[in-house]
Swiss-Prot record:
Motif (DEAD box): 154-157
Organism expressing this protein natively: Debaryomyces hansenii (strain ATCC 36239 / CBS 767 / BCRC 21394 / JCM 1990 / NBRC 0083 / IGC 2968) (Yeast)
PANTHER family tied to this protein: ATP-DEPENDENT RNA HELICASE, ATP-DEPENDENT RNA HELICASE RHLE-RELATED
Family designation: Belongs to the DEAD box helicase family. DDX49/DBP8 subfamily.
Upper lineage: Eukaryota, Fungi, Dikarya, Ascomycota, Saccharomycotina
Domain Helicase ATP-binding: 32-208
InterPro entries referenced in this protein's UniProt entry, alphabetically: DEAD/DEAH_box_helicase_dom, DEAD_box_RNA_helicase, Helicase_ATP-bd, Helicase_C-like, P-loop_NTPase, RNA-helicase_DEAD-box_CS, RNA_helicase_DEAD_Q_motif
Gene this chain is encoded by: DBP8
Binding, ATP: A45, K46, T47, G48, S49, G50, K51, T52
The protein, known as: ATP-dependent RNA helicase DBP8
Length: 441
C-alpha cells in the first residue's frame, strides 16, 4: 500500500518518495488513516520503525488544507530529539514553505519569543522551555498555542514520568481542551501510564482512542537484526576493555555510540579516548546547546566516529549508519537499555550492542534479559591476555591525564551553579504561582 492510498496528500507522498521513503511501515499503515479520521492515537512500536512520519504525515496533510496559525505542537523530552523532528518537518514541508520553530533550553529565549509571536506553523519544544515562555514571555507570545489542532507527545513514556510533571501541566493548561484538539502519543515502550490514557472517558463528539502496540509475540521491542552481547570485566579496568572493543577490526571504521550513566563519566571517557587518538564527540547535559548541536553534526557527518553520551541521546535520535552501541555503564531501567540499543540496527539494518558488565551489574543484566526476552551472548573476540598486552597500560595513562585535566578545569562546578540557579528559578515560579492563586481567590 502507498502513502497516497493511506490518505496522505499527493505533494507529501512526492516529498516522501524524494527522500526514498516509498512504502509505509506497520505503525504508519496502522496510525495514519485513523489520525486522518480524527482519532486520538497511542502508537507503540520498535525503535527505528518510522514513528515520526506516522504522526507527521497526517498532520501535514491536514495542515496543507488550512495552513493558518500554530497548527501543531510537538513535545519531546530532549533538545536533540526536538531539533531532529524539526529538521524532518522542514524537509517534508519544504515545497509548502513550512515554518517550524524549535523551543528548547540553551538557546536565546528572547529570539524564541519573537518566533512564537510570528505564529510558525508548527512548534517543536521541550516542556521546560515552553513552560518558561508560558510563565514569563507574555500573552502575545503564547496566545497562538491556544488554538492548536494537534498535540503530539513523542517518547510519551518519558514525558509522562514524574520528572516532567509540573512543566507538562503548564503546557497542557494553555492548549485547547481535549475535545477541541487531537492528541497523539508515540513511544517505543508503552508503559501503564501511557496505556491508562486509553481508558479515560471519551469527550462527547470525540472518536475513541486508537492504540497500536508492538504485537504480543513481538513484545521484545528490539529489532531482530540486532546482536546483543556482553563482556564481563573487573570494574577498575573498564576503559581497557572498551579500548579493545573499539579496536576490533569489525568496528575500527564503524560509527559507534558509547552510553554512560553520568555526565562526568562521559566527559572523562571523551578526554581519555581523544588522548588515545580516537575521533570522538560527546553529548551530555553539562555542554552548552551549541556544543551539543555541533557534536551531533560532527558525528552525523562522520568527522567523529564515536559519540559518548548519557541517556540524553538514547531517545529518538535517528542516525541510520550507527553500527555499534556500547553500554559502558549498565542502565538501572531495562527500558532505558531498549532505547539505547535502538540507536543501531535501524530500519532493517544490522547492528551490535555490547554491554561492559562489572560485578555489581549482574542483577541489572538479568532484569534486562528478562525484559527483552533474550539472553546476551558472551563476546568471544576479546581475551584478558590481549587486553593486558594491548590496552591496559596506555588506557591507564590516558585516563590519569584526562582526570587531571578535568580537575584542573574544575569540571562539575558549572553543574553546581546551574543547579543553584534552577532551584532559585523554581522558587520564583512557586511564588509567582501562589500569587496567581491568591489573586484568583
Amino acid at each position: 500500500m502507498s502513502f497516497e492510498e493511506l490518505g496522505v496528500s499527493k505533494w507529501l507522498s512526492e516529498a516522501l518518495n524524494s527522500m526514498k521513503i516509498h512504502t509505509p511501515t506497520t505503525i504508519q499503515s496502522a496510525c495514519i488513516p485513523k489520525i486522518l479520521k480524527g482519532h486520538d492515537c497511542i502508537g507503540g512500536a520498535k525503535t527505528g520503525s518510522g514513528k515520526t512520519i506516522a504522526f507527521a504525515a497526517p498532520m501535514l496533510t491536514q495542515w496543507s488544507e488550512d495552513p493558518s496559525g500554530i497548527y501543531g505542537l510537538v513535545l519531546t523530552p530532549t533538545r536533540e530529539l526536538a531539533l531532529q523532528i524539526a529538521e524532518q518537518f522542514a524537509a517534508l514541508g519544504s515545497s509548502m514553505n513550512i515554518k517550524v520553530s524549535v523551543i528548547v533550553g540553551g538557546e536565546d529565549i528572547v529570539k524564541q519569543a519573537l518566533e512564537l509571536q510570528r505564529r510558525p506553523h508548527f512548534v517543536v519544544a521541550t516542556p521546560g522551555r515552553l513552560a518558561d515562555h508560558i510563565l514569563n514571555s507574555g500573552e502575545d507570545t503564547v496566545c497562538g498555542l491556544r488554538r492548536v489542532k494537534y498535540l503530539i507527545l513523542d517518547e510519551a513514556d518519558r514525558l509522562l514520568s514524574n520528572s516532567f510533571g509540573g512543566d507538562l501541566e503548564r503546557c497542557f493548561n494553555i492548549l485547547p481542551s481535549t475535545d477541541k484538539r487531537q492528541t497523539l502519543l508515540f513511544t517505543a515502550t508503552v508503559t501503564d501510564a501511557v496505556r491508562a490514557l486509553k481508558d479515560r472517558p471519551v469527550p462527547k463528539g470525540k472518536l475513541p482512542v486508537f492504540i497500536h502496540e508492538v504485537e504480543t509475540v513481538d513484545k521484545v521491542a528490539i529489532p531482530s537484526t540486532l546482536s546483543v552481547k556482553y563482556v564481563f570485566v573487573p570494574s577498575y579496568v573498564k576503559e581497557a576493555y572498551l579500548h579493545s572493543i573499539l579496536n576490533l577490526p569489525q568496528y575500527s571504521d564503524s560509527l559507534s555510540i558509547i552510553f554512560t550513566n553520568r555526565t562526568a563519566t562521559a566527559e572523562l571517557l571523551r578526554r581519555t579516548l581523544r588522548k588515545l587518538e580516537f575521533r570522538v564527540a560527546s553529548l551530555h547535559s553539562e555542554m552548552p546547546q551549541t556544543e551539543r548541536t555541533n557534536s551531533l553534526h560532527r558525528f552525523k557527518a562522520g568527522a567523529a566516529k564515536i559519540l559518548i553520551a548519557t541517556d540524553v541521546a538514547s531517545r529518538g535520535l535517528d542516525i541510520p549508519t550507527v553500527e555499534l552501541v556500547v553500554n559502558y555503564d549498565i542502565p538501572a531501567d531495562a527500558d532505558d537499555f531498549i532505547h539505547r540499543v535502538g540507536r543501531t540496527a535501524r530500519a532493517g539494518r544490522k547492528g551490535d550492542a555490547i554491554s561492559i558488565v562489572a560485578e555489581k551489574d549482574v542483577d541489572r543484566i538479568l532484569a534486562i534479559e528478562e525484559r527483552i526476552n533474550k539472553k546476551m551472548d558472551l563476546i568471544e573476540d576479546i581475551s584478558d591476555n590481549k587486553v593486558i598486552k594491548d590496552s591496559l597500560n596506555k588506557t591507564s595513562v590516558a585516563k590519569r591525564e584526562a582526570f587531571m585535566d578535568m580537575d584542573r578545569e574544575n569540571f562539575g562546578e558549572k553543574r553546581k551553579i546551574n543547579k543553584s540557579k534552577r532551584q532559585a528559578n523554581e522558587g520564583t515560579i512557586s511564588i509567582h504561582e501562589s500569587k496567581k492563586k491568591k489573586h484568583h481567590k
